[in-house]
Regions:
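Carbohydrate-active catalytic/glycan-binding domains of CAZyme proteins
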Residues: 1-221
Length: 221
């Protein structure tokens, strides 16, 4: 579905019809440097939006997929084709320094990790690069995410269930700083209890972020 407003804070007017041709959840819209908008949704599909952003562009590729006893016309492309996914949802796409990034939760072993792939075109093909955030130690499935650049610093927003380990629907919002390597790849993020806010001098300081020792354990001063 689509809702429209003149300001980010609203009020929003819900449009009577959803965007036709999208069969999935967890949409993400990317405004690319080529001037077009692209929409990504669950299971790694991507399509270009029309200028009105209420429908898909006419020049999107189309494929036919057999599902049970029916044939379904699929619009756009499968950006996860050839990438490790098993089960994927919650994609988030962004652009940085001439590269397009497709980030997404997927099941690597038992629960979800955040993986990512890179491309030179918004619709791929994408090359898998690795993990941004590994599985939570308590096995929760709560790491849907967003990535934002604010005043020159990149931030990684996600959620976990540390405060309700026996019930994965009570989730808390988290934020960590995100850093790139010189080749454009993303450094793996280790979740912290500190986040990105200022720390009082009288409080314990989690020093993992200040150590370059590979595999160093989290310690406190």
């Amino acid at each position: 579905g689509v809702a429209i407003a003149d300001n980010p804070e609203g009020p929003y007017e819900i449009q009577p019809e959803p965007i036709k041709g999208i069969n999935g959840i967890d949409p993400c819209v990317l405004k690319a440097s080529d001037g077009n908008h692209y929409i990504f949704w669950g299971n790694g599909r991507c399509a270009k939006l029309a200028d009105n952003m209420l429908e898909l562009a006419e020049d999107n590729p189309k494929t036919v997929m057999k599902w049970r006893d029916r044939e379904l016309e699929m619009v756009g492309v499968n950006c996860l084709e050839g990438l490790p996914s098993r089960q994927a949802e919650g994609p988030f796409a962004f652009e940085y320094n001439g590269n397009y990034y497709l980030t997404y939760p997927y099941v690597r072993e038992n629960t979800e990790v955040i993986g990512y792939a890179m491309a030179k075109n918004p619709m791929g093909p994408y090359e898998y690069k690795g993990i941004i955030m590994a599985e939570h130690e308590n096995g929760c499935w709560t790491n849907h995410h967003s990535i934002v650049n604010y005043k020159g610093q990149w931030y990684f927003f996600y959620h976990r269930n540390d405060y309700s380990p026996n019930f994965d629907k009570s989730r808390s919002a988290r934020i960590e700083k995100l850093y790139f390597n010189e080749d454009g790849t993303i450094q793996e993020i280790k979740p912290t209890e500190r986040g990105v806010g200022p720390v009082k001098a009288s409080h314990k300081v989690q020093i993992d972020r200040y150590s370059t020792i590979d595999g160093a354990a989290i310690e406190y001063l």
